[in-house]
Amino acid sequence: MPIMVDDIMRLLCSISQERKMKAAVKHSGKGAMVAGAMAFVGGLVGGPPGIAVGGTVGGLLGAWMTSGQFKPVPQILMELPPAEQRKLVNEAMAIIGNLDWTDAVQLTALVMSNQAMQQRLLAMLTTYVTKELQAEIRYED
């Protein structure tokens, strides 16, 4: 049922776009790698004091590199691998399974007219992004 997956992914993108959701996926591994590399280079250049200076500079650089990289949630959702999209669709189907639709436009209209269903899908999406993707969510004004 690739059409159903596409319909539900478009619905989730519409909901997150309407709420202007952005998420920053934490790249702690990248930051740690930068900090470690800088400590190593500092140690080679300056000995033990160089390790301290390199680690400090690397830690600050790593934190700066990985902070504030917010992307729109619809973009993140569409970039998910197919297995993750199916997982998300299965969670959404538990909420919208009783609806009958023919295409993404009709499905979106049905859900957008039902505030309770919209809230449940938004909560499911927020939980998925924060827990599964380990991302921080921000809503634009």
Swiss-Prot record:
InterPro entries per record: C19orf12 (IPR033369)
Keyword flag Transmembrane: yes
Bilayer-crossing regions: 33-53
Keyword terms, alphabetized: Cytoplasm, Endoplasmic reticulum, Membrane, Mitochondrion, Transmembrane, Transmembrane helix
The family this protein is said to belong to: Belongs to the C19orf12 family.
Membrane topology of this protein: Single-pass membrane protein
GO cellular component: cytosol; endoplasmic reticulum; mitochondrial membrane; mitochondrion
A GO biological process held by the record: autophagy
Subcellular location: Mitochondrion; Mitochondrion membrane; Endoplasmic reticulum; Cytoplasm, Cytosol
Domain of life: Eukaryota
Pfam families per record: C19orf12
Main location: mitochondrion
Protein name as catalogued: Protein C19orf12 homolog
